[in-house]
Amino acid sequence: MFSLQDICRKHLFLLPSSFNEYILQVLGLYWEKHGSLQRIRKDAVFVQRNITLSTNEALRIAASEGNERVVKLLLSWEGNFHYVIIGALEGDQYDLIHKYNSQIKDYHVILSSIQNANTFEKCHQLYNCTMWRLVQNAIKYNMLSILQKHRNLLTDEGDNQELFEKACEEQKYDIVLWIGQTLMLDEPKSIFDIALERIDFSLLIMGYSLLFANKMSSIDIHDEEDLTSLLTEHLEKAATKGCLFFMQETLKHGGNVNIAVLSKAVEYNHRKILDYFIRRQKCLSRKDIEKLLLIAIKDGGSKKTLNLLLSYLNYSVQNMIGKIVEAVINDGDFTIIIILKKKKINLVDSVLAGFLDHFHTYCFIKVFIHEFAIRPEKIIKMAARKDKLDIIIEFFNDIYPHKDDLGTILNILKNIVNTMKHKEGKEVLIGLIHKIYRIIHLENKEMFNLVRFYIMHNANIQFISICKDCFNLAGFKPFLSECLDIAIKKNYPDIVRNIKIQLKYE
């Protein structure tokens, strides 16, 4: 008989109509006060052949009635034993509770399944929870009636503040409103911080509802300056998040959309906000838009953001070129230079000059050089004019890293000097040429060519130095005699005098 009962309980999904109450009782498929009980699928049962219940709901009801036989049956039908505890709590069936309680390691796992506030509270009592834990969980699981029931115990402003913030974080709006309207709070403004952090529009509206209902004692809504300051702060935070609809809601109550507010939209590339307030609402003057453009440059704004701001200025930036160059030099982002160059506004030379003035290593400007395909001769000449010998050396070390390349570098420098007019710049490069000459080996002809080069550019010190190395070379004096004519024609008296001195020696 036991095996027949077991088979029927587990596998009989359709009860024959001929089964009367007695047979059902024998098979264990009869529920007192309810009628026949049969399993119709894995998660549902049929009661009295016409009522469909989920297995867990039936389990809860059976447990609340203390019907252990039906409870066992439903558990064998894959019912969740959590509902045994819930139902037993509802019906005060403590024998069942003690029997199944040991299977629950953490009572929190059943709280989300409890719908009844009294049962919710009984569960906390069963597990010896504190009142503080009860009210915290009441917020988490949206049991407002529990907070209302224990209203007289919620007197500490600090604790209430924590509960209020928890309700905001959990997005339990009814509880937020009740706490805000009913309990004393330390800092109710936190609702705005949470609303903006979570981008919760409902919470923002609720915050303004509490604010203008005078439920925030720390804020005097009748003090226009304080109120404007608060609302403008909200606008700034909303702009940071890119929440245009938050800003529109805030503006219904006041606040100012100013440079500080829109600079946040610039910093985080929220172009919809910029377009709405600059183009559609016309909130800013041209001067203010120029300030925003400089902020965008300093913050490394995206191409789209920079283009948007430039479009408001019709790409007319002649009156602020100096400021643009300064911003790029100080902050190192040259996206704006790329954009303006495409619009036929070329600031490459100005920025390169600024980089050379402000930085002392080649690596700072290497990316810039590659981006704009700047010719090596141009960089070297500009660095020489500014006496930035270290940058010139770093540049050549990057392009020509091997010692065997020094001869090539020497020839490049000579060619640059030949096309250069800046006197001090030429002297810097000639000094570098002579240092390279001291390191490498030159053939006689190459040395004579270098002598002529020094004479052509009136490099008297280097000329005297190389003459000491060439003095005993064959053909040097006849060569020097030829060079004398060059020095005379060029009117280089110091060179002429030193050549004559060299020619006097036998």
Curated annotation (Swiss-Prot):
Gene3D superfamilies: Ankyrin repeat-containing domain. It comes from the Viruses. InterPro entries: Ankyrin_rpt-contain_sf, MGF_505. Pfam families: DUF249. Plays a role in virus cell tropism, and may be required for efficient virus replication in macrophages. Belongs to the asfivirus MGF 505 family. This is Protein MGF 505-4R. It comes from African swine fever virus (isolate Pig/Kenya/KEN-50/1950). The lineage of its organism: Viruses, Varidnaviria, Bamfordvirae, Nucleocytoviricota, Pokkesviricetes.
